[in-house]
A protein has these predicted regions:
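Helix-to-beta-strand junctions that scaffold the AdoMet/dcAdoMet cofactor pocket
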Residues: 120-122
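Class I SAM-dependent transferase core
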Residues: 1-31, 35, 65-82
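Conserved SAM-binding motif I beta-strand of class I
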Residues: 56-61
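A short SAM/SAH-binding and catalytic strip from SAM-dependent methyltransferases
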Residues: 99-113, 118, 132
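Short alpha-helix immediately C-terminal to the canonical SAM-binding loop
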Residues: 66-68, 134, 138
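Conserved SAM-binding loop of SAM-dependent methyltransferases across substrates and taxa
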Residues: 41-54
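SAM/dcSAM-binding transferase cores
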Residues: 139-193
Length: 193
């Protein structure tokens, strides 16, 4: 089953695994919870879980074949404390909030912020994996970030032996997100905050 466009083994390690685990060099993930939105083949959450067994992982993805793959993978490599949800982030219950919410290659930041920040605990973090060309997205997302109760805490640029510089945009949740968010996806896409 092909869940990623990158198939050369060395490139998979660099562009998926190393990129995914960089978050663990920035934060202590022990005994924390993470929601991975649109995880696809399980990046960044599965490598982070392998690295940090006490990390409580929840993955949501809109394609059932991806969720089925991740379920099979989790069973084969004996991953525990992992919840797999077939669905859309904006339709997920807000009963549970997370220490971290992550997303890689899901949407532009002004849309992604509304999908992610409602599920971050106060004083928790939304971490967006982006390329070095993040500035335009960041500029257009400033209003959304503010309305959803977060601030940009830091921008971390890093290289992983590829031709690209990667970036973690780290947003800290400083107040609760208004309960009207996230809106339905059609509205988020048509009228981003």
């Amino acid at each position: 089953m092909n869940l990623t466009n990158i198939t050369e083994e060395n490139e998979v390690y660099k562009k998926h695994f190393y990129d995914s685990i960089f978050l663990s060099e920035v934060f202590d993930l022990n005994n924390k919870s993470i929601l991975d939105i649109g995880a696809g083949a399980g990046f960044p959450s599965i490598p982070l879980k392998i690295l940090c067994n006490t990390l409580d992982v929840t993955i949501i993805d809109g394609l059932n074949k991806r969720i089925n793959f991740l379920k099979e993978l989790s069973e084969k490599i004996n991953i525990e404390k992992i919840t797999l949800i077939h669905g859309r982030a904006e339709e997920m219950s807000k009963d549970r909030l997370f220490d971290f919410v992550t997303a890689r290659a899901v949407a532009r930041l002004n849309i992604l912020a509304e999908l992610a920040l409602p599920y971050v605990k106060k004083d928790g973090y939304f971490v967006a994996y982006k390329s070095v060309n993040y500035q335009a997205e960041l500029d257009e997302a400033k209003n959304a970030i503010n309305q959803l109760g977060a601030i940009l805490e830091r921008i971390i640029e890093y290289d992983i032996e590829t031709d690209l510089t990667h970036v973690l945009l780290v947003f800290k949740k400083i107040k609760n997100t208004p309960s009207i968010y996230p809106r339905q996806f059609a509205k988020i896409k048509k009228q981003p905050l």
